[in-house]
UniProtKB/Swiss-Prot annotation:
The active site is at C70 (proton donor/acceptor), C194 (proton donor/acceptor). Its EC number is 5.1.1.3. Signal peptide: none annotated. One of its GO terms (biological process) is peptidoglycan biosynthetic process. PROSITE patterns: ASP_GLU_RACEMASE_1. The keyword Cell wall biogenesis/degradation applies. PANTHER family: GLUTAMATE RACEMASE. InterPro entries: Asp/Glu/hydantoin_racemase, Asp/Glu_race, Asp/Glu_racemase_AS_1, Glu_race. It comes from Cereibacter sphaeroides (strain ATCC 17029 / ATH 2.4.9) (Rhodobacter sphaeroides). Provides the (R)-glutamate required for cell wall biosynthesis. Belongs to the aspartate/glutamate racemases family. This is Glutamate racemase. Keywords: Cell shape, Cell wall biogenesis/degradation, Isomerase, Peptidoglycan synthesis.
């Protein structure tokens, strides 16, 4: 019973780390489309086709359930995939859902009308493609009313993290937070809408201030996955071994991933 985890690069490893800790008995197959990263600057059609290709590769590894551990793919491709492409015996889940569940304090299956929630002012930090898709605002509007969302496209942050340039990544995060606070001086909550950003969570929190609740995805996604598999065990696929696949150069990606997670990760060519 293997579960697939997909990202355009290394950010999804933050999600993989959390789901492995939460579900140590489940094998996971991670697919990084490093040859085409970052997705955050690509158009929606391009993201759709790349995400479908990666998902098919994970199905071939015996993963009937695939997690898009990439907000750009979840925002720009998932709805179209679910409506036009995914067969009935497979499931593809995005990473927005657990965030919105946490923010609105309601379960995904709860289809009651949108209602007032405690949080009124939300800052969203994400890639330019995720911000342009407005997927977060759309999903939030189905569940909550009266929430003001101010979105900040965080150009350059993913590239800096993938290159291992922490000083540049930190400087960019601080400048993006400053830019957002000029438009929304007092957010109550901040959504880190990219799976790379948990690595920068302390910097976001420091720049935003202690009064802002920062929602980061990895642990929320892990809890959601555990709940999903408990309810739908038939989607734990036939695969039996954990592995790491990449469209990039395996040695280079392995070295970056090892730096990224601070434990040895060995990728093989997809």
């Amino acid at each position: 019973m293997a579960v697939g985890v997909f990202d355009s690069g290394l950010g999804g490893l933050t999600v993989l780390d959390a789901v492995q800790r939460r579900l140590p008995e489940v094998p996971f197959v991670y697919f990084g489309d490093n040859a085409h990263a970052p997705y955050g600057v690509r158009d929606a059609d391009d993201i759709f086709h790349l995400t479908c290709a990666a998902t098919e590769r994970l199905w071939a590894e015996g993963c009937d359930l695939v997690i898009l551990a990439c907000n750009t793919a979840s925002a720009a491709a998932l709805k179209r995939m679910q409506e036009t492409w995914i067969p009935k015996d497979k499931r593809v889940l995005g990473v927005f859902v657990p965030l919105i569940e946490a923010l609105t304090e309601r379960q995904w299956g709860d289809n009651s009308p949108p209602r007032e929630v405690a949080v009124k002012h939300v800052a969203l930090f994400a890639t330019p493609a995720t911000v342009a898709s407005r997927a977060f605002q759309r999903e939030l509007a189905f569940r909550a009313i009266g929430v003001d969302v101010e979105a900040q496209p965080c150009g350059g942050v993913v590239d800096a993290i993938e290159q291992g340039d922490e000083i540049l990544a930190e400087a960019l995060v601080r400048s993006h937070v400053e830019a957002l606070k000029r438009r929304m001086p007092h957010p109550q909550a901040a959504i880190l809408g990219c799976t790379h950003y948990p690595l920068m969570e302390p910097i976001f929190q420091e720049a935003l201030g202690p009064e802002v609740s920062v929602y980061s995805q990895a642990n929320l996604v892990a809890e959601s996955l555990a709940d999903y598999l408990a309810r739908k065990p038939e989607f734990a696929g036939a695969g039996t071994e954990s592995k790491f696949l990449t469209t990039g150069e395996p040695r280079s990606v392995s070295n970056k991933a090892t730096q990224f997670l601070r434990r040895r990760i060995t990728f093989e060519a997809a």
